[in-house]
Amino acid sequence: MERLTSPPRLMIVSDLDHTMVDHHDPENLSLLRFNSLWEHAYRHDSLLVFSTGRSPTLYKELRKEKPLLTPDITIMSVGTEITYGNSMVPDHGWVEALNNKWDLGIVKQEASNFPELKLQAETEQRPHKVSFYVEKSKAQEVTKELSQRFLKRGLDVKIIYSGGMDLDILPQGAGKGQALAYLLKKLKTEGKLPVNTLACGDSGNDAELFSIPDVYGVMVSNAQEELLKWHAENAKDNPKVIHAKERCAGGIIQAIGHFKLGPNLSPRDVSDFLEIKVENVNPGHEVVKFFLFYERWRRGEVENSEAYTASLKASVHPGGVFVHPSGTEKSLRDTIDELRKYHGDKQGKKFRVWADQVLATDTTPGTWIVKLDKWEQDGDERRCCTTTVKFTSKEGEGLVWEHVQQTWSKETMVKDDSSWII
Protein backbone atom coordinates (compact mmCIF):
# COMPACT_ATOMS: atom_id res chain seq x y z
CA MET A 1 0.00 0.00 0.00
CA GLU A 2 3.04 2.25 0.38
CA ARG A 3 3.12 2.83 -3.39
CA LEU A 4 -0.06 4.94 -3.10
CA THR A 5 0.45 8.46 -1.80
CA SER A 6 -3.23 9.41 -1.96
CA PRO A 7 -6.58 7.67 -1.40
CA PRO A 8 -7.14 4.77 -3.84
CA ARG A 9 -9.60 5.55 -6.62
CA LEU A 10 -11.13 2.09 -6.21
CA MET A 11 -10.63 -0.82 -3.83
CA ILE A 12 -11.98 -4.15 -5.03
CA VAL A 13 -12.46 -6.76 -2.32
CA SER A 14 -13.23 -10.09 -3.94
CA ASP A 15 -13.78 -13.66 -2.91
CA LEU A 16 -11.82 -16.12 -5.05
CA ASP A 17 -13.53 -19.48 -5.65
CA HIS A 18 -16.58 -19.05 -7.90
CA THR A 19 -16.26 -15.25 -7.73
CA MET A 20 -12.94 -14.05 -9.12
CA VAL A 21 -12.12 -17.60 -10.25
CA ASP A 22 -14.57 -19.56 -12.39
CA HIS A 23 -13.77 -23.25 -11.96
CA HIS A 24 -16.14 -24.05 -14.85
CA ASP A 25 -14.10 -21.91 -17.26
CA PRO A 26 -11.07 -24.02 -18.29
CA GLU A 27 -9.67 -21.17 -20.41
CA ASN A 28 -10.04 -18.68 -17.51
CA LEU A 29 -11.42 -16.12 -19.95
CA SER A 30 -13.40 -14.01 -17.48
CA LEU A 31 -10.43 -13.89 -15.08
CA LEU A 32 -8.08 -12.88 -17.90
CA ARG A 33 -10.57 -10.17 -18.96
CA PHE A 34 -10.48 -8.77 -15.43
CA ASN A 35 -6.68 -9.01 -15.28
CA SER A 36 -6.26 -6.92 -18.43
CA LEU A 37 -8.76 -4.32 -17.23
CA TRP A 38 -7.14 -4.02 -13.80
CA GLU A 39 -3.57 -3.75 -15.03
CA HIS A 40 -4.31 -1.21 -17.76
CA ALA A 41 -6.79 1.00 -15.90
CA TYR A 42 -6.53 0.51 -12.13
CA ARG A 43 -3.26 -0.94 -10.84
CA HIS A 44 -1.51 2.46 -10.72
CA ASP A 45 -3.99 4.16 -8.38
CA SER A 46 -6.24 1.49 -6.84
CA LEU A 47 -6.11 -1.47 -4.46
CA LEU A 48 -6.88 -5.12 -5.17
CA VAL A 49 -7.86 -7.24 -2.18
CA PHE A 50 -8.54 -10.98 -2.26
CA SER A 51 -10.78 -12.19 0.56
CA THR A 52 -10.95 -15.97 0.64
CA GLY A 53 -12.00 -18.77 2.92
CA ARG A 54 -8.86 -20.63 1.85
CA SER A 55 -5.92 -21.06 4.19
CA PRO A 56 -2.52 -19.69 3.09
CA THR A 57 -1.60 -23.20 1.88
CA LEU A 58 -4.65 -23.62 -0.34
CA TYR A 59 -4.46 -20.00 -1.50
CA LYS A 60 -0.90 -20.55 -2.75
CA GLU A 61 -2.03 -23.74 -4.50
CA LEU A 62 -4.74 -21.79 -6.32
CA ARG A 63 -2.19 -19.21 -7.45
CA LYS A 64 -0.25 -22.02 -9.15
CA GLU A 65 -3.37 -23.30 -10.89
CA LYS A 66 -5.01 -20.07 -12.07
CA PRO A 67 -3.75 -16.82 -13.67
CA LEU A 68 -4.41 -14.71 -10.59
CA LEU A 69 -2.97 -11.23 -10.27
CA THR A 70 -0.88 -10.33 -7.23
CA PRO A 71 -3.17 -8.51 -4.79
CA ASP A 72 -2.11 -5.60 -2.61
CA ILE A 73 -3.81 -7.22 0.39
CA THR A 74 -4.81 -10.84 1.04
CA ILE A 75 -7.50 -11.76 3.56
CA MET A 76 -7.53 -15.51 4.19
CA SER A 77 -9.13 -18.16 6.37
CA VAL A 78 -12.56 -16.47 6.33
CA GLY A 79 -11.29 -13.09 7.51
CA THR A 80 -8.99 -14.34 10.27
CA GLU A 81 -5.67 -13.57 8.55
CA ILE A 82 -4.67 -10.32 6.82
CA THR A 83 -1.39 -10.00 4.93
CA TYR A 84 0.19 -7.33 2.74
CA GLY A 85 2.06 -7.35 -0.55
CA ASN A 86 4.07 -9.96 -2.41
CA SER A 87 5.75 -11.27 0.72
CA MET A 88 2.42 -11.52 2.56
CA VAL A 89 3.47 -9.65 5.70
CA PRO A 90 0.94 -10.44 8.48
CA ASP A 91 -1.08 -7.75 10.25
CA HIS A 92 -0.22 -8.33 13.91
CA GLY A 93 -2.77 -5.78 15.09
CA TRP A 94 -5.53 -7.91 13.61
CA VAL A 95 -4.16 -11.03 15.32
CA GLU A 96 -4.29 -9.29 18.71
CA ALA A 97 -7.85 -8.11 18.12
CA LEU A 98 -9.03 -11.67 17.43
CA ASN A 99 -7.66 -13.12 20.67
CA ASN A 100 -10.49 -11.54 22.69
CA LYS A 101 -12.71 -14.27 24.23
CA TRP A 102 -11.22 -16.93 21.98
CA ASP A 103 -9.79 -20.27 23.10
CA LEU A 104 -8.83 -22.70 20.36
CA GLY A 105 -8.66 -25.65 22.76
CA ILE A 106 -12.20 -25.17 24.06
CA VAL A 107 -13.55 -24.70 20.53
CA LYS A 108 -12.06 -28.02 19.40
CA GLN A 109 -13.22 -29.77 22.58
CA GLU A 110 -16.86 -28.69 22.24
CA ALA A 111 -16.98 -29.38 18.50
CA SER A 112 -15.73 -32.93 19.08
CA ASN A 113 -19.06 -33.70 20.77
CA PHE A 114 -20.85 -33.51 17.41
CA PRO A 115 -20.34 -36.59 15.20
CA GLU A 116 -22.10 -34.71 12.37
CA LEU A 117 -19.03 -32.49 12.05
CA LYS A 118 -16.24 -33.87 9.87
CA LEU A 119 -12.93 -32.07 10.36
CA GLN A 120 -11.48 -30.48 7.22
CA ALA A 121 -7.84 -30.94 6.21
CA GLU A 122 -5.14 -29.94 8.70
CA THR A 123 -4.07 -27.06 6.44
CA GLU A 124 -7.51 -25.49 6.96
CA GLN A 125 -7.23 -25.45 10.75
CA ARG A 126 -5.82 -22.05 11.69
CA PRO A 127 -5.08 -20.17 14.94
CA HIS A 128 -8.42 -18.34 14.71
CA LYS A 129 -10.45 -20.75 12.55
CA VAL A 130 -11.65 -24.31 13.00
CA SER A 131 -13.29 -25.78 9.90
CA PHE A 132 -15.61 -28.72 9.35
CA TYR A 133 -17.86 -30.30 6.76
CA VAL A 134 -21.49 -30.85 7.69
CA GLU A 135 -24.52 -32.03 5.75
CA LYS A 136 -26.87 -29.24 4.75
CA SER A 137 -29.84 -30.85 6.51
CA LYS A 138 -28.00 -30.87 9.85
CA ALA A 139 -26.20 -27.53 9.66
CA GLN A 140 -28.85 -25.33 11.31
CA GLU A 141 -29.40 -27.61 14.31
CA VAL A 142 -25.67 -28.13 14.90
CA THR A 143 -24.98 -24.41 14.64
CA LYS A 144 -27.66 -23.56 17.20
CA GLU A 145 -26.50 -26.11 19.78
CA LEU A 146 -22.81 -25.32 19.30
CA SER A 147 -23.45 -21.62 19.84
CA GLN A 148 -25.15 -22.32 23.17
CA ARG A 149 -22.26 -24.51 24.33
CA PHE A 150 -19.66 -21.84 23.49
CA LEU A 151 -21.68 -19.20 25.32
CA LYS A 152 -21.75 -21.33 28.46
CA ARG A 153 -17.95 -21.72 28.26
CA GLY A 154 -17.48 -17.94 28.17
CA LEU A 155 -16.41 -17.73 24.53
CA ASP A 156 -17.62 -15.14 22.05
CA VAL A 157 -17.54 -16.90 18.69
CA LYS A 158 -19.39 -16.92 15.41
CA ILE A 159 -20.30 -19.88 13.24
CA ILE A 160 -20.46 -19.42 9.48
CA TYR A 161 -22.07 -21.96 7.16
CA SER A 162 -21.35 -21.62 3.45
CA GLY A 163 -21.05 -23.50 0.19
CA GLY A 164 -23.70 -26.00 1.26
CA MET A 165 -21.19 -27.95 3.34
CA ASP A 166 -18.51 -25.76 5.00
CA LEU A 167 -18.87 -24.82 8.65
CA ASP A 168 -16.28 -22.43 10.11
CA ILE A 169 -15.92 -21.44 13.76
CA LEU A 170 -14.23 -18.06 14.30
CA PRO A 171 -13.83 -15.38 16.97
CA GLN A 172 -16.87 -13.09 17.05
CA GLY A 173 -14.72 -10.21 15.83
CA ALA A 174 -13.51 -12.16 12.79
CA GLY A 175 -15.02 -12.77 9.38
CA LYS A 176 -14.73 -11.22 5.97
CA GLY A 177 -16.91 -8.26 6.91
CA GLN A 178 -15.00 -7.37 10.07
CA ALA A 179 -11.69 -7.77 8.27
CA LEU A 180 -12.87 -5.31 5.62
CA ALA A 181 -14.14 -2.88 8.28
CA TYR A 182 -10.75 -3.10 10.02
CA LEU A 183 -8.94 -2.39 6.74
CA LEU A 184 -11.13 0.61 5.93
CA LYS A 185 -10.55 2.04 9.41
CA LYS A 186 -6.80 1.51 9.05
CA LEU A 187 -6.73 3.15 5.61
CA LYS A 188 -8.75 6.10 6.92
CA THR A 189 -6.26 6.59 9.76
CA GLU A 190 -3.47 6.69 7.16
CA GLY A 191 -5.37 9.23 5.05
CA LYS A 192 -5.94 6.64 2.31
CA LEU A 193 -9.64 5.77 2.60
CA PRO A 194 -10.68 4.55 -0.88
CA VAL A 195 -12.93 6.84 -2.90
CA ASN A 196 -15.04 3.77 -3.72
CA THR A 197 -15.01 0.17 -2.50
CA LEU A 198 -16.60 -2.76 -4.33
CA ALA A 199 -17.15 -6.07 -2.51
CA CYS A 200 -17.67 -9.20 -4.63
CA GLY A 201 -18.90 -12.63 -3.57
CA ASP A 202 -20.94 -15.75 -4.27
CA SER A 203 -21.57 -17.60 -0.98
CA GLY A 204 -22.74 -17.26 2.61
CA ASN A 205 -19.36 -16.30 4.03
CA ASP A 206 -19.37 -13.26 1.71
CA ALA A 207 -22.63 -11.81 3.09
CA GLU A 208 -20.82 -9.76 5.74
CA LEU A 209 -18.94 -7.89 3.00
CA PHE A 210 -22.21 -6.37 1.80
CA SER A 211 -23.16 -5.16 5.29
CA ILE A 212 -20.29 -2.67 5.60
CA PRO A 213 -21.57 0.93 5.26
CA ASP A 214 -20.77 2.88 2.07
CA VAL A 215 -19.50 -0.20 0.24
CA TYR A 216 -20.84 -1.25 -3.16
CA GLY A 217 -21.55 -4.95 -3.57
CA VAL A 218 -22.00 -7.47 -6.35
CA MET A 219 -23.28 -11.00 -6.06
CA VAL A 220 -22.10 -12.75 -9.22
CA SER A 221 -24.78 -14.44 -11.35
CA ASN A 222 -23.76 -17.88 -10.08
CA ALA A 223 -24.19 -16.85 -6.41
CA GLN A 224 -25.34 -19.66 -4.13
CA GLU A 225 -28.76 -20.01 -2.59
CA GLU A 226 -27.62 -19.06 0.92
CA LEU A 227 -26.29 -15.66 -0.27
CA LEU A 228 -29.37 -14.91 -2.39
CA LYS A 229 -31.56 -15.74 0.61
CA TRP A 230 -29.52 -13.43 2.84
CA HIS A 231 -29.86 -10.66 0.25
CA ALA A 232 -33.63 -11.12 0.00
CA GLU A 233 -33.96 -10.90 3.79
CA ASN A 234 -31.45 -8.14 4.48
CA ALA A 235 -30.50 -6.06 1.46
CA LYS A 236 -33.09 -6.35 -1.32
CA ASP A 237 -33.86 -2.61 -1.10
CA ASN A 238 -30.20 -1.58 -1.01
CA PRO A 239 -29.36 -0.04 -4.42
CA LYS A 240 -25.65 -0.44 -3.67
CA VAL A 241 -25.85 -4.24 -3.88
CA ILE A 242 -26.68 -5.95 -7.19
CA HIS A 243 -27.06 -9.49 -8.49
CA ALA A 244 -24.97 -9.53 -11.67
CA LYS A 245 -26.06 -11.17 -14.89
CA GLU A 246 -22.55 -12.40 -15.65
CA ARG A 247 -20.62 -15.17 -13.94
CA CYS A 248 -17.62 -14.68 -11.69
CA ALA A 249 -15.08 -12.05 -12.82
CA GLY A 250 -17.43 -11.06 -15.64
CA GLY A 251 -19.94 -10.02 -12.97
CA ILE A 252 -17.28 -7.91 -11.25
CA ILE A 253 -16.58 -6.07 -14.50
CA GLN A 254 -20.34 -5.60 -14.96
CA ALA A 255 -20.62 -4.07 -11.47
CA ILE A 256 -17.79 -1.61 -12.15
CA GLY A 257 -19.82 -0.33 -15.08
CA HIS A 258 -23.18 -0.45 -13.29
CA PHE A 259 -21.97 1.67 -10.37
CA LYS A 260 -19.87 3.91 -12.66
CA LEU A 261 -16.71 3.23 -10.63
CA GLY A 262 -14.36 3.68 -13.58
CA PRO A 263 -13.50 2.14 -16.96
CA ASN A 264 -15.14 -1.24 -17.54
CA LEU A 265 -14.00 -2.12 -21.06
CA SER A 266 -11.29 -4.75 -20.84
CA PRO A 267 -8.63 -4.64 -23.57
CA ARG A 268 -9.57 -8.29 -24.16
CA ASP A 269 -13.05 -7.14 -25.22
CA VAL A 270 -11.59 -5.13 -28.12
CA SER A 271 -11.20 -7.32 -31.18
CA ASP A 272 -8.60 -5.19 -33.00
CA PHE A 273 -5.67 -3.99 -30.90
CA LEU A 274 -5.06 -1.15 -33.39
CA GLU A 275 -8.47 0.25 -32.37
CA ILE A 276 -7.62 0.46 -28.67
CA LYS A 277 -7.25 4.14 -27.90
CA VAL A 278 -6.44 5.83 -24.60
CA GLU A 279 -7.18 9.50 -23.95
CA ASN A 280 -4.00 10.12 -22.00
CA VAL A 281 -0.46 8.78 -22.31
CA ASN A 282 -0.52 5.46 -20.44
CA PRO A 283 2.65 3.35 -20.58
CA GLY A 284 1.05 0.60 -18.50
CA HIS A 285 -1.73 0.30 -21.04
CA GLU A 286 0.80 0.04 -23.87
CA VAL A 287 2.43 -2.96 -22.19
CA VAL A 288 -0.89 -4.72 -21.53
CA LYS A 289 -2.00 -4.07 -25.11
CA PHE A 290 1.25 -5.39 -26.60
CA PHE A 291 1.28 -8.67 -24.68
CA LEU A 292 -2.40 -9.22 -25.50
CA PHE A 293 -1.56 -8.75 -29.17
CA TYR A 294 1.38 -11.14 -28.74
CA GLU A 295 -0.96 -13.81 -27.37
CA ARG A 296 -3.46 -13.34 -30.21
CA TRP A 297 -0.71 -13.34 -32.82
CA ARG A 298 0.65 -16.69 -31.68
CA ARG A 299 -2.85 -18.14 -31.34
CA GLY A 300 -3.58 -17.02 -34.89
CA GLU A 301 -6.49 -14.87 -33.74
CA VAL A 302 -5.29 -11.78 -35.61
CA GLU A 303 -4.54 -11.58 -39.30
CA ASN A 304 -0.95 -12.03 -40.44
CA SER A 305 -0.97 -8.50 -41.77
CA GLU A 306 1.77 -6.05 -42.68
CA ALA A 307 -0.32 -3.36 -40.96
CA TYR A 308 0.31 -4.91 -37.55
CA THR A 309 4.05 -5.24 -38.11
CA ALA A 310 4.25 -1.67 -39.40
CA SER A 311 2.30 -0.38 -36.40
CA LEU A 312 4.62 -2.17 -33.97
CA LYS A 313 7.77 -0.95 -35.71
CA ALA A 314 6.45 2.61 -35.75
CA SER A 315 6.17 2.51 -31.95
CA VAL A 316 9.76 1.26 -31.49
CA HIS A 317 12.89 3.45 -31.44
CA PRO A 318 15.20 2.61 -34.39
CA GLY A 319 17.99 1.86 -31.91
CA GLY A 320 15.72 0.10 -29.40
CA VAL A 321 17.22 -2.92 -27.63
CA PHE A 322 15.67 -6.10 -26.21
CA VAL A 323 17.62 -8.03 -23.56
CA HIS A 324 16.41 -11.65 -23.60
CA PRO A 325 16.23 -13.57 -20.25
CA SER A 326 19.26 -15.54 -21.46
CA GLY A 327 21.23 -12.28 -21.49
CA THR A 328 21.37 -12.05 -25.28
CA GLU A 329 20.82 -8.57 -26.70
CA LYS A 330 19.04 -7.94 -29.96
CA SER A 331 17.33 -5.11 -31.79
CA LEU A 332 13.68 -4.53 -30.88
CA ARG A 333 12.84 -4.15 -34.55
CA ASP A 334 14.59 -7.44 -35.35
CA THR A 335 12.53 -9.06 -32.58
CA ILE A 336 9.34 -7.82 -34.24
CA ASP A 337 10.51 -9.22 -37.58
CA GLU A 338 11.27 -12.54 -35.90
CA LEU A 339 7.78 -12.60 -34.42
CA ARG A 340 6.27 -12.90 -37.90
CA LYS A 341 7.37 -16.53 -38.29
CA TYR A 342 5.54 -17.49 -35.09
CA HIS A 343 2.11 -16.40 -36.33
CA GLY A 344 -0.46 -19.06 -35.39
CA ASP A 345 2.08 -21.50 -33.94
CA LYS A 346 -0.12 -21.86 -30.83
CA GLN A 347 -3.42 -22.07 -32.67
CA GLY A 348 -5.87 -24.41 -30.94
CA LYS A 349 -3.54 -24.80 -27.96
CA LYS A 350 -3.81 -23.69 -24.36
CA PHE A 351 -1.62 -20.64 -24.73
CA ARG A 352 -2.26 -17.49 -22.68
CA VAL A 353 -0.25 -14.40 -21.77
CA TRP A 354 -0.95 -11.89 -19.00
CA ALA A 355 0.77 -8.99 -17.28
CA ASP A 356 0.86 -8.61 -13.49
CA GLN A 357 1.93 -5.77 -11.18
CA VAL A 358 2.26 -3.24 -14.00
CA LEU A 359 3.70 -0.10 -12.42
CA ALA A 360 4.89 2.92 -14.41
CA THR A 361 7.22 5.60 -13.04
CA ASP A 362 7.64 8.99 -14.68
CA THR A 363 11.41 9.34 -14.24
CA THR A 364 12.01 12.55 -16.21
CA PRO A 365 9.66 14.61 -18.38
CA GLY A 366 8.78 12.43 -21.35
CA THR A 367 10.42 9.26 -19.99
CA TRP A 368 8.74 6.34 -18.22
CA ILE A 369 10.03 3.12 -16.70
CA VAL A 370 7.44 0.34 -16.54
CA LYS A 371 8.03 -2.74 -14.39
CA LEU A 372 5.84 -5.83 -14.52
CA ASP A 373 5.71 -9.59 -14.36
CA LYS A 374 4.97 -11.07 -17.79
CA TRP A 375 3.39 -14.52 -17.52
CA GLU A 376 3.07 -17.08 -20.28
CA GLN A 377 1.15 -20.34 -20.06
CA ASP A 378 1.73 -23.01 -22.70
CA GLY A 379 -0.25 -26.15 -21.95
CA ASP A 380 0.52 -27.05 -18.34
CA GLU A 381 3.79 -25.10 -18.25
CA ARG A 382 3.85 -21.60 -16.78
CA ARG A 383 6.77 -19.20 -17.01
CA CYS A 384 7.26 -15.69 -15.71
CA CYS A 385 9.73 -12.96 -16.58
CA THR A 386 10.35 -9.83 -14.56
CA THR A 387 10.19 -7.21 -17.29
CA THR A 388 11.40 -3.61 -17.42
CA VAL A 389 10.41 -1.32 -20.29
CA LYS A 390 11.68 2.18 -20.99
CA PHE A 391 9.34 4.47 -22.92
CA THR A 392 9.92 7.97 -24.25
CA SER A 393 7.33 10.36 -25.55
CA LYS A 394 7.22 13.49 -27.64
CA GLU A 395 4.18 15.71 -27.36
CA GLY A 396 1.48 14.57 -29.76
CA GLU A 397 3.47 11.57 -31.00
CA GLY A 398 2.55 8.88 -28.47
CA LEU A 399 4.90 6.48 -26.71
CA VAL A 400 8.08 4.98 -28.14
CA TRP A 401 9.60 1.70 -26.89
CA GLU A 402 13.29 2.36 -26.17
CA HIS A 403 14.47 -0.62 -24.16
CA VAL A 404 13.06 -3.94 -22.90
CA GLN A 405 14.87 -6.18 -20.43
CA GLN A 406 13.64 -9.50 -19.07
CA THR A 407 14.95 -11.84 -16.36
CA TRP A 408 13.45 -15.10 -15.17
CA SER A 409 11.40 -14.77 -11.99
CA LYS A 410 12.14 -16.80 -8.86
CA GLU A 411 9.04 -18.94 -9.54
CA THR A 412 10.30 -20.03 -12.94
CA MET A 413 12.68 -22.93 -13.45
CA VAL A 414 13.80 -23.00 -17.09
CA LYS A 415 15.95 -25.69 -18.70
CA ASP A 416 15.66 -24.31 -22.22
CA ASP A 417 14.86 -20.64 -22.80
CA SER A 418 15.18 -20.73 -26.59
CA SER A 419 11.39 -20.91 -27.02
CA TRP A 420 10.88 -17.61 -25.17
CA ILE A 421 10.44 -14.85 -27.75
CA ILE A 422 9.61 -11.72 -25.74
UniProtKB/Swiss-Prot annotation:
GO MF terms held by the record: magnesium ion binding; sucrose-phosphate phosphatase activity
Recorded GO CC terms: cytoplasm; cytosol; endoplasmic reticulum; nucleus; plasmodesma
Q: Looking at the keywords, is Lyase present? A: no
Question: Which pathway, metabolic or otherwise, does it act in?
Answer: Glycan biosynthesis; sucrose biosynthesis; sucrose from D-fructose 6-phosphate and UDP-alpha-D-glucose: step 2/2
Under CDD domains, the record lists:
HAD_SPP
- What biological process terms from GO does the record include? sucrose biosynthetic process
For the protein in the UniProt heading, the enzyme class is hydrolase
Keywords of the record, alphabetical order, are: Hydrolase, Magnesium
Which Enzyme Commission number(s) are listed?
Answer: 3.1.3.24
Catalytic reaction annotation: sucrose 6(F)-phosphate + H2O = sucrose + phosphate
Write down the required cofactor(s).
Mg(2+)
The family database entries (Pfam families) matched by this protein are listed as:
S6PP (PF05116), S6PP_C (PF08472)
What the entry lists under InterPro entries is as follows: HAD-like_sf, HAD-SF_hydro_IIB, HAD_sf, NTF2-like_dom_sf, SPP-like_dom, SPP_C, Sucrose_Phosphatase, Sucrose_phosphatase_pln/cyn
- Record bears the keyword Magnesium: yes
What PANTHER family does the annotation carry?
SUCROSE-PHOSPHATASE 2-RELATED (PTHR46521:SF4)
Q: Describe the protein's quaternary organization and the partners it interacts with.
A: Homodimer.
- Give the UniProt family note: Belongs to the sucrose phosphatase family.
Question: What does the record give as the function of this protein?
Answer: Catalyzes the final step of sucrose synthesis.
Which named protein is this?
Answer: Probable sucrose-phosphatase 2
Name its species: Arabidopsis thaliana
**What gene is this protein translated from?**
SPP2
